[in-house]
Amino acid sequence: MRTFSGKRSTLALAIAGVTAMSGFMAMPEARAEGFIDDSTLTGGIYYWQRERDRKDVTDGDKYKTNLSHSTWNANLDFQSGYAADMFGLDIAAFTAIEMAENGDSSHPNEIAFSKSNKAYDEDWSGDKSGISLYKAAAKFKYGPVWARAGYIQPTGQTLLAPHWSFMPGTYQGAEAGANFDYGDAGALSFSYMWTNEYKAPWHLEMDEFYQNDKTTKVDYLHSFGAKYDFKNNFVLEAAFGQAEGYIDQYFAKASYKFDIAGSPLTTSYQFYGTRDKVDDRSVNDLYDGTAWLQALTFGYRAADVVDLRLEGTWVKADGQQGYFLQRMTPTYASSNGRLDIWWDNRSDFNANGEKAVFFGAMYDLKNWNLPGFAIGASYVYAWDAKPATWQSNPDAYYDKNRTIEESAYSLDAVYTIQDGRAKGTMFKLHFTEYDNHSDIPSWGGGYGNIFQDERDVKFMVIAPFTIF
């Protein structure tokens, strides 16, 4: 998209006006110019169309509409430079416009806005258009130290993370960290974040945090994390997080990269752990002991045109919930947490006892005189998925000794415009066929995060632009 450059006198005047109205002393021009001259205003226009059908095993195995909608998004993201090389401001907003939606489509579709403005008020009744302020943060830096506060997205090493549609979710809180470079000995980075409210990108209003009963208040979430890069292709990461008085979470990751046949092979081991502090068999009692998800990942780029991925996960999640969650509050869209595993094959493959293997490949067609085009495919097979080890009110399908299998495959086609005013605009088509190898209805039988067979088609357009 077109880039505009030059003096930003209008922006400077607006900032000066805001400063004056706020009652702050005007800063000398020489010390304020970094705030203006180093600022950026970027954005994007986004289109999403989805058709997803799901099998209903209670109605003759018919496939029924689960999602069917088309939605536009657009955003503007202002990031200032730093006045006095220390103080700055970031502000961003986006809009969602619902173009069409099938009456049988499920809600929320997570691209438009839910008709329920808050996470804990969600009633699954519909979607709507609207505008959301998703970033409004004061920022600070001094030497190796940085900090941000306000409406923010986590950027450091903690376990807190936002949901994503085209845009990210938003926390109300503060985050601070530091980066230290020790030359050949390595580099250390660490950060801490505290938050008391959150909104997913499909909710318009912030909500507080609660335990699983949606009434017992959790005053805050917080997390501390660190990363050490040894500068020899070996990286260690660790983090700890808490939902006040309720959930503890743990994370560790080791990554190593080395060459095979002249191309890089990236490997990692990842551990995610969580446990609750409730042990009374109430609705807030999620896990028996520590639940965890472990992962091994391998990524290889061959001949500079083929990206190959081989990844595996293993889950332990004994207890009433029956599956592992990376977020510290269990209610849908109430917060989110770090998980560096993303397969885009519909299921989370995170049931108690479940093991899963993923293989994916993406082929860049530039050597076929098709610059910007890429095609890909992936497959997941998972087994030993167990239901919750106990439930207060089990349904007729519940059998704690049962295990089921899941599998899915996906196909991708991508085109990215290589030059001109629309350079960087991407078109992507994604198809998934998901198979639940059982006749248990969606979410039934103690499998609270497994649904029935699906066919899913997504078409996306992402058109970024820069104003200055």
Curated annotation (Swiss-Prot):
InterPro entries according to UniProt: OM_porin_bac (IPR005318), Porin_dom_sf (IPR023614)
Transmembrane segments: none
Main localization category: membrane
Gene Ontology CC: one annotated term: pore complex
Coiled-coil boundaries: none
Compartments reported by the entry: Cell outer membrane
Keyword GTP-binding set for record: no
Annotated GO MF terms: channel activity; porin activity
Domain of life assignment: Bacteria
Keyword annotations from UniProtKB, A to Z: Cell outer membrane, Ion transport, Membrane, Polysaccharide transport, Porin, Signal, Sugar transport, Transmembrane, Transmembrane beta strand, Transport
Signal peptide span: 1-32
Membrane topology per record: Multi-pass membrane protein
Induction statement: In the absence of chitobiose, expression of chiPQ is silenced by the MicM small regulatory RNA (sRNA), which sequesters the ribosome binding site of the chiPQ mRNA by an antisense mechanism. In the presence of chitosugars, the chbBCARFG chitobiose operon is induced and acts as an RNA trap to degrade the constitutively expressed MicM, leading to the translation of chiPQ.
GO BP field: diacetylchitobiose metabolic process; monoatomic ion transport; oligosaccharide transport; polysaccharide transport
A Pfam family hit: OprD
Function: Involved in the uptake of chitosugars.
NCBIfam families assigned to the protein according to its UniProt record, in alphabetical order: ChporEntbacChiP
Similarity section: Belongs to the outer membrane porin (Opr) (TC 1.B.25) family.
Protein's name according to its UniProt entry: Chitoporin
Source organism (scientific name): Escherichia coli (strain K12)
Encoding gene per record: chiP
